[in-house]
């Protein structure tokens, strides 16, 4: 799923990209990746690296794009619905000129908490 988040006194989701948007991509499909590669000319292998659950934190450069991968907490429910288990998953941040794209697979509260905090802070 591709989200275009416009920064205007907090973050608001918008239908189309413009240069004031942050692009947040959650569990991208092949169609999502193809759209991002064709529209923004991002290196396609960046998405493969981010999708690797064992990918280590690092940064890379290709064709003007900078990729930074960090690991963020991921809450996983157990089968018996007891206390959740926490693991970490890769979060990729791609940056070129004024374009910021974040990509992750799985459930990530770091991004949603950041958006919610930013929206509450405006008040």
Tell me the role of every PLM-derived stretch.
Residues 1-123:
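Peripheral, non-transmembrane regulatory/ligand-interaction domains of membrane transport proteins
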